[in-house]
Amino acid sequence: NSFIICAVCRGDDVFIPNGDFIIIPGDILHITGSHHDLGKIVKELISKKSTNVKSIMLIGGSRISIYLTNMLTASGKDVVVIEKNKRNCDKLYEHCPKATVINGDASDYSLLAEEGIDKVDAVVTLTDTDEVNFLVSMYSESIGVKKNITKINNQNLSRMLTKMGMESYV
């Protein structure tokens, strides 16, 4: 049950935190940990701000998605996972029997609409493609989804998210 904060971005400055470093609101944290522990962090981000989150749409079927889906369904949440790769969908079907798994492309607006993105309480984008994560998160925010958590690897995109007012990304 651990993770490491590797770097902290504050404005245009980057810090490698030590034991005395103090994190302040607005800092961008770069963390590393096991898939299981990162899943726990995302679950905490979902439940921290919105205690009434009951339905979640996950975009992407990675190992983190499997851990997160199982944690969320075990706590009584309704979870829909959209994954493009059929093989990954098969793993999700096998390991996450309480979730609804959809084999499809999340960049397809009609699929998101068909699967009820406008009715969920939270959207978590966990694909390997920053641009898909970014666009789906921006779209879900624009239609009123209460909580959006976005996986972003590219530092420039994470700065953009901050400037656009998105609070939660990993």
PLM ranges: what are they?
Residues 1-170:
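Cytosolic regulatory regions of ion transport systems
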